[in-house]
Amino acid sequence: MYLSICCCFLLWAPALTLKNLNYSVPEEQGAGTVIGNIGRDARLQPGLPPAERGGGGRSKSGSYRVLENSAPHLLDVDADSGLLYTKQRIDRESLCRHNAKCQLSLEVFANDKEICMIKVEIQDINDNAPSFSSDQIEMDISENAAPGTRFPLTSAHDPDAGENGLRTYLLTRDDHGLFGLDVKSRGDGTKFPELVIQKALDREQQNHHTLVLTALDGGEPPRSATVQINVKVIDSNDNSPVFEAPSYLVELPENAPLGTVVIDLNATDADEGPNGEVLYSFSSYVPDRVRELFSIDPKTGLIRVKGNLDYEENGMLEIDVQARDLGPNPIPAHCKVTVKLIDRNDNAPSIGFVSVRQGALSEAAPPGTVIALVRVTDRDSGKNGQLQCRVLGGGGTGGGGGLGGPGGSVPFKLEENYDNFYTVVTDRPLDRETQDEYNVTIVARDGGSPPLNSTKSFAIKILDENDNPPRFTKGLYVLQVHENNIPGEYLGSVLAQDPDLGQNGTVSYSILPSHIGDVSIYTYVSVNPTNGAIYALRSFNFEQTKAFEFKVLAKDSGAPAHLESNATVRVTVLDVNDNAPVIVLPTLQNDTAELQVPRNAGLGYLVSTVRALDSDFGESGRLTYEIVDGNDDHLFEIDPSSGEIRTLHPFWEDVTPVVELVVKVTDHGKPTLSAVAKLIIRSVSGSLPEGVPRVNGEQHHWDMSLPLIVTLSTISIILLAAMITIAVKCKRENKEIRTYNCRIAEYSHPQLGGGKGKKKKINKNDIMLVQSEVEERNAMNVMNVVSSPSLATSPMYFDYQTRLPLSSPRSEVMYLKPASNNLTVPQGHAGCHTSFTGQGTNASETPATRMSIIQTDNFPAEPNYMGSRQQFVQSSSTFKDPERASLRDSGHGDSDQADSDQDTNKGSCCDMSVREALKMKTTSTKSQPLEQEPEECVNCTDECRVLGHSDRCWMPQFPAANQAENADYRTNLFVPTVEANVETETYETVNPTGKKTFCTFGKDKREHTILIANVKPYLKAKRALSPLLQEVPSASSSPTKACIEPCTSTKGSLDGCEAKPGALAEASSQYLPTDSQYLSPSKQPRDPPFMASDQMARVFADVHSRASRDSSEMGAVLEQLDHPNRDLGRESVDAEEVVREIDKLLQDCRGNDPVAVRK
């Protein structure tokens, strides 16, 4: 019937396919248990829904129909879903009682085109315990039963199969150890128990024994069954059979034929009837080999030859025979038959050997080295066992030609030690390079007739010294791995071979230390030290690492030294298509871009170019462009390789004004990845721009990347130039701000300065000489102005600076002399300078530190009449005008708004600096608050109120001449916050005599310098000029010109002097005194040092030409100020001439080098 059904289906559906499905389900599952899904497991295509199936005479019952079912009451298939399920509980034991493997089969017709052959295996579970056929077993055993007597027991039954079946038996409740249990197996694997008597039974002591037999299966957990064994001890027969002799001896040749009678035994029993009838048999403990060689007749007691006898195997055989009667409880009788075999020459000699060298011998072994110990035996006796032995192809006993070496000889011989024992030794030196292995054959022959021969061969390997390193089969191993691999993946193997033997040839592999970038190679790969297998330790990325190399070391285990070699392994990472294309042109928003095309665009008009990027390489990165949707009217075409979209139809009136194209970019990897973009193309009115050609067919276009690169490059160059320009301008303005001070602010006004580039003539009123040494008043407000050790250790500090236009750099003309270490800032001026502590000529120096200081000794000063304290207070507030000069504002509105100088509510820094400059040491430290300052100073004019204030505004007034009688200079000074009635006191000199007086300028005794508020009284000093002053050298020969010229000729900058480090110190050392002449009284010259005017000019010119040098160069100048070789004490100088020379020198410098002055 099945054949007819299949034929019908084959005729009806010619495209049928056959599929096999195997399922398994444990037994005892309930009804409705799903075993499997036929459609999913067979990977069948889903059929039509039941509502759509039908027609053509086909059934509408479902997609799955059961054609054949071996157990329809147990299994069924859902017609619609294809689920295979159970209809009821399945019992394997009842279904397949006698079969270990239980299997059901079905044939299902699915989707009208596939036939599924289904097999369901019913798996056994341990649901059945072993069972016995009865609960008790009754046994009768005679008390005379000998120990070892066996009694079969009833076996248990377990319907389960396999491991769940019956496994073993246990015997319990045997308190006296009389019985034992032996479990045996039949040919089919079933197990059965036997009861064994361990000790003799005594009915008189106990006539009944109760035992428990337990059967166990192999399930988890195991199940068991028990049965009770009742043993009854029965009384036995009183008489047993008796043999004629207790033992018999029989001689028999070893080659006796089968059936030969060995002996005829006879035993008698005094009992009558069954108790006297005797039966013969072998005893239970007769070996199986004897049973194989002999047989016995149970009634007659005749023993015959059953097998082949061998003297050499056993020359004497013993046969135990028992005789028992047929009465109840028989007691058997026993006798022993000894069979002695007669030897025949039927055995060849036997050769055995023990290798001393374990089959290996070093090639350095000397002659006579023992290789093996040989023993030759013959199982035959007498002459048949007499032997002769020799080495085939070697020397020794009975030596002769043989095989195994050059000329058919081997370098070995046989030496006899004692009977049948020989030693194989070398008889000449060995050479492994000639032959590395020998096959030694030993021949033995006996003395029988005819003689029999035997041979024995063994191999001797010649060991080499460890003189060969491992050698790789390749110098370079190239391995490949796909990216995104799994860590631990096998990459390949390297193989190194070592011709040495043993440990000398055992090769181990390792990776030599190296790095890939900054990462150790041990984080990339590992090698199996035994077989050279290389594994990846990480997942590789082709885009990051395309290939890398490392070295593998192969090392043998030889002694005394390991030999090694290495090979290079190159791992190439293969690209995997793991990156999808990314569309970069046109710019997409939500995967959509809008484009416009003129209506008069002709055929081949370039609408746009679609560009995509793919990070993969090779075929995985090669892209293809195509239009997948929206081009039903074939209005556009796209170049598959370049992505250019061109028109195929003019945009006439009847064409849709908006076209939506779907462009797909696909790479060529496996599997392929793609990206999709939607392009909305709108036709707009108007004509093509001029220069855009109408092309019919292919349109030549230019690459957009070139103008893009050019545009970006141009923009970058313009931005770079703008940044450089701004940086240069900001640097110049910052430099002007840093060099700005209130003393020269007035030159920034156009009416005074005459424009930015116009220079103002410098006169003597532009130079201010004040004393910079002040006593420290407040330790909390100290500004350190020393920049070198020479300044820190010098008692006096000099600072010379002229008022220059704002375009000039800070301190272009400045002469420094060591001065006091600290400059105390009054607490009232903390808003301007308290937070600043600097060194050297800092950009934030106060005007007081920039004022020129000149040293005088006993200078006969004319009276310097100062105004009252009220007048000075009035003059100190003139710079509070909003248009006042600022230390930071250049006057052109370019100051930073964060600068504090713009705050007009704060006090002027110039006012503060003036107060600092006018502070001096007094005996009275008592201070009182200042009076309220007036708005204007009495010295101010209308011009200065409009254009800015000058020195005349803040300088003290000159009083009338009738006040000149005051000889103490401190009475001519007014110091803010100090009482007006200053007690007259002179400063102590450094002279040990302690005379308190002012020394005349140029005298030996030197005191502290006096503070000069105004230079005019001293310019009127009636001091005659020295004759040295009359002889002023010409400008062409002066060293000043020699210094200025190279500075002004170097591109208009003062930096030209920097080409000669130390030039300033070298030039100044010719004219300036050293610190030692002022510090130590013991080293003072007898005549005080003086400087001629030309020498002062030279020094100031040198300083001026090197004003831009750094603080370290200025420190070198200061160290040269105390040159010990200067002897200018004979020269007298007039202060007015000094100022005149400085004024002339500065005007010359500005006239000759305006660029340098500006910078």
Swiss-Prot record:
Family annotation (Pfam families): Cadherin (PF00028), Cadherin_2 (PF08266)
Bilayer-spanning residue ranges: 708-728
Domain Cadherin intervals: 18-132, 133-243, 244-351, 353-472, 473-583, 589-695
Record-linked SMART domains: CA (SM00112)
Subcellular location: Cell membrane
Membrane topology, from the record: Single-pass type I membrane protein
UniProt region (Disordered), positions on chain: 858-909, 1108-1132
Name of the protein in question: Protocadherin-17
Lineage per the UniProt record: Eukaryota, Metazoa, Chordata, Craniata, Vertebrata
